[in-house]
């Protein structure tokens, strides 16, 4: 399978996000990336938008509903939100939407900080593997993977996608 170029996806996502926000009458949203890949995508997206806004970051490790099964990620860091959440229009950015559980955890954490006016979900990739009814408002590309395949985003400079075959991993 040939994977898309993240830089090209980001450029198209910037155009699509501007159109989406304009259609909804949103002129000054707050941007939040989900660690780690979502932060990289958010940084690239803000650059493509030529937007100097501060970037918030979320680490949703403690909010995941599979925490008891998978344990705590070894590099948990605090979330950093350099702006108010209450009443704000938010753009929540993740790298890969798979089950929807990471986004659900991010929404739960955001609502602990306040009630936003709206949340626009932006994802570099949607893998159409949702276990929860969560869909991005803006997406770079939609891919279908075999059950033994995963996508890994590396970065931040340059952003690159890698297809991993879990059946050959030791």
From Swiss-Prot:
CDD domains: PRTases_typeI. The gene is pyrR. A motif (PRPP-binding) lies at residues 90-102. Regulates the transcription of the pyrimidine nucleotide (pyr) operon in response to exogenous pyrimidines. It comes from Pseudomonas syringae pv. tomato (strain ATCC BAA-871 / DC3000). NCBIfam families: PRK05205.1-1 (NF003545). InterPro entries: PRibTrfase_dom, PRTase-like, PyrR, PyrR_bifunctional. Transmembrane segments: none annotated. This is Bifunctional protein PyrR. It holds the Pfam family Pribosyltran. It catalyses: UMP + diphosphate = 5-phospho-alpha-D-ribose 1-diphosphate + uracil. SUPFAM superfamilies: PRTase-like. Keywords: Glycosyltransferase, Transcription, Transcription regulation, Transferase. GO terms for biological process: regulation of DNA-templated transcription. Belongs to the purine/pyrimidine phosphoribosyltransferase family. PyrR subfamily. Its EC number is 2.4.2.9. Gene3D superfamilies: 3.40.50.2020. It comes from the Bacteria.
């Amino acid at each position: 399978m040939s994977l898309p170029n993240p830089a090209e996806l980001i450029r198209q996502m910037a155009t699509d996000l501007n159109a989406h926000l304009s259609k909804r009458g949103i002129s000054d949203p707050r941007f939040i990336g989900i660690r780690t890949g979502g932060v990289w995508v958010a940084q690239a997206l803000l650059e493509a938008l030529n937007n100097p806004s501060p970037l918030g970051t979320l680490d949703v490790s403690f909010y995941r509903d599979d925490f008891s099964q998978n344990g705590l990620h070894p590099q948990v860091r605090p979330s950093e939100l350099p702006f108010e959440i209450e009443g704000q229009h938010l753009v929540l950015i993740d790298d890969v939407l798979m089950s929807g559980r990471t986004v659900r955890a991010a929404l739960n954490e955001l609502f602990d900080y306040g009630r936003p006016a709206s949340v626009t979900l932006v994802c570099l990739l949607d893998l159409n593997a949702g276990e929860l009814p969560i869909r991005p408002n803006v997406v770079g590309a939609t891919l279908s993977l075999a059950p033994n395949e995963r996508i890994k985003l590396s970065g931040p400079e340059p952003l690159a996608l890698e297809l991993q075959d879990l059946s050959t991993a030791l």
